[in-house]
Amino acid sequence: MDRAAGLSQTLAAEAARLARRQSDREEELELVRRAQRYEPDALGRIYEIYFPKIYQYSYLQLSDPQLAEDIASGVLLQVVESIDKFHYRGTPFGAWVFRIARNRIIDLHRRKKRRQHVELNESIPTDYGAPHQETERVLEHERVRGALDYLTDDQRQVVLLKFAEGLDNQAIASVIGRSEGAVKSLQHRALVALRKSLSDSG
């Protein structure tokens, strides 16, 4: 394959990827518009999509299944109560949801610090239904979870949002309140630190 043909294929693949992304975003916005009209099936769909994601995001930071479930439930309740306040300005709806989750986790850490009490529960529940089965498989990787503890908070947020939840740099920047350039730098430093930690523990 000559260079021109290779470039053409690359550009075509990128165009297709962007088209799929635009289509996904339009579908999500339509779902949000329906949820803002409080259509039950739309609200239910948002719950189905985001509860497992927020549960995993929370558990990887809290190591406590009950706290993670409480956070996920509280976030989804807040999303329903304030969904009419969401206005699309280029940032995906998912970034708005994860920002709520991040703020709740930060508040929880602050309350724990004030009480000088940190409760960690390393067990994984076995009685969850299907929505949590994939999460449980992911969380079996104890070395990875332990390595996350060696990252700064912003580095950990970038890794979780990028690789566990699939958000792009623009969305991550919105969630953590940093620039896209800062997100790229945090991602690079986090991956270097993770490789070192996993290598040392291996």
Question: What feature does the model see in each segment?
Answer:
Residues 2-13, 137-138, 174-177, 191-202:
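C-terminal edge and immediately downstream basic/flexible tail or linker adjoining helix-turn-helix-like DNA-binding
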Residues 11-17, 24-25, 115-137, 141:
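Internal acidic/polar
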Residues 12-16, 47-65, 82, 98, ...:
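Amphipathic, Lys/Arg- and hydrophobic-enriched alpha-helical face
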Residues 26, 32-55:
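A short, charge-rich alpha-helical start-of-domain segment used by transcription regulators
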Residues 36-37, 60-65, 74-91, 111-113:
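Sigma70-family region 2
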Residues 70-77, 91-103:
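Structural recognition of an alpha-helix C-terminal capping motif at a helix-to-coil junction
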Residues 81-88, 98-120, 137:
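Arg/Lys-rich amphipathic alpha helix in sigma70-family domain 2
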Residues 146-157, 161, 165-182:
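Helix-turn-helix DNA-binding module
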